[in-house]
Amino acid sequence: MGKLYTALGLMSGTSMDGVDASIIKSDGERVYSALFDRYFEYGDKIRQKILAIRQKILVPDHLVKHESEIKDIEREITFFHSNVVKEILNNNKIDVDLLGFHGQTIFHDSKKKITKQLGDGKLLSQLTKKKVVYNFRQNDLKNGGQGAPLTPIFHNLIANKYLKEELDKFYSVNILNIGGISNITQTVKWDELDKKKNYIKACDIAPGNCLIDEWVRKKSKKKYDIGGVLAGIGKTDELILNQALENFNIGPPYEDSLDIKDFDISFAKGLSLEDGTSTL
């Protein structure tokens, strides 16, 4: 077992609706325990700013074109995260060693090795007086990765932790993670006659909830389909769905990470709010 760290992780996904905060204790490999979890919703103003700037950044050059606006929003988001950290630490008697700061993704292109998350790690460290680990996706790209998905490291830890005793010699675990984008992790351990083989394979495979979120925002005053109510009421249009699946052209070998801008909802434009939500 390696050194145990108590870390406060801050994650804001492609739904762009707020920050998930978790305090965990882990050695990063096998030992893991959750100490605190809470969701902090963005205010309407900051959320609209994030949505607006993301829609403006269509190609890498737009990051330069809108640099001033990006910096302003980035500072605002960093202060939001700082307030989250202070509220958590002030209300919970837990001493954390470091903060994990993902930031808010507004652009991701794995082929061009460019990704942008809103969030200033150095400023967050100054505001909270804590060590901050950040630039996860940028560093993954620099080291030959796709910048996404990042969850496989945690999936592998879960497999090692919970399956070691039951399947000591061999296991193959597949974990499907459905966020804005869906990704899958396969973690394998094989140990037979001292022939050891351990590996992790992971990739993005398809859109997850990002299309539903966009559809609901455009067709109603809701931010997303709360509890799947709209989809439950609606009827899936199989013809439109099958045509969309053919046009998406997603399949093996799943070499490139995906971004929500790789997909659009135009194919469902003739459907009602409920039927479109069900189909998407």
Predicted regions and their residues:
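Gly/Thr-rich phosphate-binding beta-strand-loop-beta motif of the actin/hexokinase/Hsp70
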Residues: G2-L35, Y171-W190
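Short glycine-rich, Thr/Ser-proximal phosphate-binding strand/loop in the N-terminal lobe
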Residues: M11, S15-S68, K197-A202
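A glycine- and small-aliphatic-rich helix-loop capping segment at beta-alpha/alpha-beta transitions
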Residues: I23-R30, K112-L123, I158-N160, V188-Y199, ...
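Short glycine/proline- and acidic residue-enriched helix-loop micro-motifs
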Residues: V59-I73, K223-L230, L273-E274
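Short beta-strand-loop/turn "lid" adjacent to the catalytic site in phosphate-handling enzymes
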Residues: D61-G121
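Glycine-rich phosphate-binding loop and adjoining helix at the ATP-binding site
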Residues: D95-N156
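Glycine-rich phosphate-binding loop of actin/hexokinase-like ATP-binding domains
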Residues: N160-A231
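A contiguous, well-structured pocket-lining segment that forms one wall/lid of small-molecule binding clefts
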Residues: K221-L280
